[in-house]
Structure formats: structure tokens, C-alpha cells
Amino acid sequence: MGKRIISQNRGKGTPTYRAPSHRYKTDAKLLRFKDEVVAAKVIDIQHDSARNGPVALVKLPDGSETYILAVEGLGTGDVVYAGDNVEIASGNITYLKNIPEGTPVCNIEAQPGDGGKFIRASGTFGFVVSREADKVLVQMPSGKQKWFHPNCRAMIGVVAGGGRTDKPFVKAGKKYHKMKSKAAKWPRVRGVAMNAVDHPFGGGKHQHVGKPKTVSRNAPPGRKVGSIAARRTGVRR
């Protein structure tokens, strides 16, 4: 019997595959509001290893502090407003039903009150396309259009940190430090590059799979690699 392959080790769960969430600063939820408009002053813009975009540390009227996602153009000293009747300006938070068509939005709630689930990555934004009495249509960054409840809240603007992917890592060491903050094992070694004891595709005089790559859905752990229960393989013609 060979060694456990990576997918088996990941299932067991070890620090290698566990996100270092004790180093994460915040969930970066939307500011809560009821009947009154909440004004929050931006104290600082900070990096959070949990996400790609920066977060803004804001001070609430009661003196408490919390984090929100930072949008493009937001800086220290700015004031962010959250409420039912707020100005349609970058950084403000309100219900989708109040946002005009064509307005860029981010950090949209999946269900009213959950604090924001969609469009949170750096440089991303969606558009309000249209609205009906009981739902609002938003175009997502992927181009797909999705309906939301009109009482789902959203932040107006574009998530800061756009253009992050334009700059190459250049050195493997920089990529290493980035991946250390994620729940990911890196670098990712190909199965055919391993020894036979480490992977079903490993071993041999040269790098080749050496056996059918398709495998049964009922294959045992450790053999279940490749094209799992594939209906077809090869280039679709």
C-alpha cells in the first residue's frame, strides 16, 4: 500500500490544509441600521490577510469601531452613511430597492440581514439592471444576472484593490507567503511527477499516466484520481 495521497490527507484535516483564521481581522459585514441613518467615520485603511481587497476601520456614533470593505476613492477622514434614505454615493450602504439602475454596487446580501455575501473580491462590482415590485435584477461581475430581494442591502461603489492581478509575483517566495495565508497547499505537484508510492500516476522511466485516467465513482480512496466517473473524455468535436 502506498502513501496517502493529498486528497486523503486534506480530508483528515491538518494545519497544512486549515485556513489560519486566527490571523484574520474581520468578516467585513455591512453596517447595521434600522430607522435612522448611521454615520461612520473612516479611521484607517488596513490590509486583511483573509481577503484580497483592503478593509476600512470605521468609528460608529456610539464610539465603537468595526471594519467594512473599502471601496475605491474611500480614504481616512471620510464619512460613510448607512440607512434607508442616504445619498447615492460611493461607500454608502442602503437597500437595493433604493439604488438606481446602472449604479455600481458591491457586497450584496444573499438574504436580507446576512451582512453581505456577493461581490466582495478586490476590484469587483455589479450593476443594478432593473427592478420589479418584489425583486431587483443585478448583473454580476461574471456577466450573469441574478435576482435579489429588494430589502437586501448593498454597498455603492467598486471594491478597492482593482488591478491587483496586473502585477506578477516574479519570485516563488512571494507566492509562497501569499499562499501561507490561505487554506491551500502550495506548490501543487503533478501526479505524474511523483514517485509511484505517492500517487497512482507516479513512477516510470518518463512522466506518463501509464493506466486509464478514467476511474469508477466507487473507486476506493487513494485510487480515485483523474477523470472521475467521466461520461466522455477528449476534445469535444
Swiss-Prot record:
Domain of life, source organism: Archaea
Pfam families registered for this protein in UniProt: Ribosomal_L2, Ribosomal_L2_C
Gene3D superfamilies, per the entry: 2.30.30.30, Nucleic acid-binding proteins, Ribosomal protein L2, domain 3
Region spans: Disordered: 1-20, 201-237
GO CC terms: cytosolic large ribosomal subunit
Single annotated GO MF: structural constituent of ribosome
One of the protein's GO biological processes: cytoplasmic translation
Listed SUPFAM superfamilies: Nucleic acid-binding proteins (SSF50249), Translation proteins SH3-like domain (SSF50104)
SMART domains named among the record's database cross-references: Ribosomal_L2 (SM01383), Ribosomal_L2_C (SM01382)
Function description: One of the primary rRNA binding proteins. Required for association of the 30S and 50S subunits to form the 70S ribosome, for tRNA binding and peptide bond formation. It has been suggested to have peptidyltransferase activity; this is somewhat controversial. Makes several contacts with the 16S rRNA in the 70S ribosome.
Family matches, as HAMAP family: Ribosomal_uL2_A
Family affiliation: Belongs to the universal ribosomal protein uL2 family.
Protein name, UniProt field: Large ribosomal subunit protein uL2
Organism: Archaeoglobus fulgidus (strain ATCC 49558 / DSM 4304 / JCM 9628 / NBRC 100126 / VC-16)
Gene name as annotated: rpl2
